[in-house]
Curated annotation (Swiss-Prot):
Keyword set, alphabetical order: Ribonucleoprotein, Ribosomal protein
Function: This protein is located at the 30S-50S ribosomal subunit interface and may play a role in the structure and function of the aminoacyl-tRNA binding site.
One term under GO cellular component: cytosolic large ribosomal subunit
BP GO annotations: translation
Family of the protein in this entry: Belongs to the bacterial ribosomal protein bL19 family.
Species: Rickettsia prowazekii (strain Madrid E)
Gene3D superfamilies (alphabetical): 2.30.30.790
Gene Ontology MF terms: structural constituent of ribosome
Keyword check for Ribonucleoprotein: yes
Matching InterPro entries: Ribosomal_bL19 (IPR001857), Ribosomal_bL19_CS (IPR018257), Ribosomal_bL19_sf (IPR038657), Translation_prot_SH3-like_sf (IPR008991)
NCBIfam families in UniProt: rplS_bact
Protein name: Large ribosomal subunit protein bL19
């Protein structure tokens, strides 16, 4: 490994020390919680910074794995309009990433979903079977 790779690995380890990033792919539905900092002006004229969390849930249509600059693109339908938002995977602004359901697709980039709406934009859900406990045969 060269110096740049070592530097990236150290920074990724620091950024992921207090949060868990799940394994997800294109086609999975994720819920990304993002930290938002608002400025509010108080009555005496001072600025006050308030911090809140906002959830963004949608289908991952692209994932870009590039070390510390890795990102993923999430698409959702909001009030009848398609909205896409790109999140940096290791950004401190991203508070948490939760996988809501896993999808079955045959492509790495699902840009074709931009031109589909309604039932045509559905993605099959991956059914995860629960392991049955093995019983001893006597």
């Amino acid at each position: 490994m060269n110096i740049i790779d070592n530097f990236e690995q150290e920074n990724i380890a620091k950024l992921t020390a207090n949060k868990k990033i799940p394994d997800f792919e294109a086609g999975d539905t994720v819920k990304v919680t993002v930290k938002i900092i608002d400025k509010a002006i108080e009555k005496d004229g001072k600025e006050k910074l308030t911090e809140r969390f906002q959830a963004y849930e949608g289908v991952v249509i692209a994932k870009r794995n590039r070390g510390i600059t890795s990102s993923f693109l999430v698409r959702k339908i909001s009030h009848g309009e398609g909205v896409e938002r790109r999140f940096m995977t290791y950004s401190p602004i991203v508070h948490s990433i939760d996988v809501v359901k896993y999808g079955v697709v045959r492509r790495a980039k699902l840009y074709y979903l931009r031109h589909r709406n309604g039932k045509a934009a559905r993605i099959r859900e991956k059914l995860i079977s629960r392991a049955k406990p093995k019983t001893a045969i006597s």
